[in-house]
Amino acid sequence: MIDAGIYVHVPYCRRKCLYCDFFSGGYKTADWEGFVRCIINEYNERRGEISGKADTLYIGGGTPSLMPDTPFRSLLRFLIDNISWGIGKREISLEVNPEDVSEEKARMWKREGVNRVSMGVQSFNDDELMRVGRRHDSRRAIEAYDVLRKHLDNISIDLMFGLPGQTVESWEKSVETAVTLNPEHISAYSLMLEEGTPMTVLAEKGRIELPDDRLNDEMWRRLSVRLSESGYRQYEISNYSKQGYESKHNGKYWRQVPYLGLGPSAHSYDGDRERRFNPPDITGYLKRFGSGQEGREPFYRREMLTDEEIKEEYILTRMRVSEGINLSDFRERFGKAAEERLLHNLMTLPNQELVENKEGNISLSSDGIMVADSVILALAM
């Protein structure tokens, strides 16, 4: 049995980035001790939902690197002491922003058990950072990386392409800076205009100019070539790593592995057919778990997946990773009729060069990755 993962959502930010639709609230009024107490109470109430062991803990947000030292230590020490860990190496990840990194914090994070950090850089171009509402500049990002490198040997950098005013040349410079820093892992995401975000409003009003699809495709191509030349392997559509440094935790989301999500807006999955969603409600969360009284109504909302939904999710997530879908495993899970339907969908794709079928594994080709959403949806029909 594959070990589960634990996710903790820290819902506080200094200021929301213009493109972000993740759930978060202002940090100035945050009751950090109360929040940590609620996470502990929720874990104690729900720990039985994970029947086996866990081998990953991911603290994301929001901006968890905002958390002061004392409540952070309390949270991490409790979780490390109380999670039923598997026998393999633990991966304990923390999302950080460059402006929060200091020698003292990095030393404390490492001392308390963090062994992987994911730093949201997005760009090494100061104009691009300003346009999307980031608080750091490129120099601060590089300084933060250098500090983290003194204390940690597993660092991931997040980059974004398709930003307002971004060019292929400025993107190449950001990628080159990231490669020069030599992190173990690089994630690269295309800017998505999410409904209701300030970035979407600005775009709809014509106040910002975004790169078109042709430029976005060229940025992705140049990224992939440069990272491949530098020893990074693309193991998922948006993720590249040095050998052995793939994100163990995120891999659980793509491979139908159970995980428990704690905190407002966090979601969980039992590895079979049940998903649970915590509402995006900080006040309600603090009220529900502040007292530590068990036996009340669950805070989360349940969703039971149908057989068809389970199959569709399997296709949608497995086709994101480099190994793709193993046909033997697919047939064992869903039956021969489902396999024949998948193969029929594969054979009727307008362009057969978008998907590779090698030794019983179906995966996206490099051209297929460029149009991944449409290809994967066609296979899942």
Where do the PLM segments sit?
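Short amphipathic alpha-helical interaction segments
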Residues: 336-348
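Short, amphipathic alpha-helical interaction segments positioned at domain boundaries
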Residues: 369-381
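C-terminal scaffold of the Radical SAM
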Residues: 2-3, 24-46, 53-336
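Minor-groove-contacting beta-hairpin "wing" of winged helix-turn-helix DNA-binding domains
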Residues: 361-365
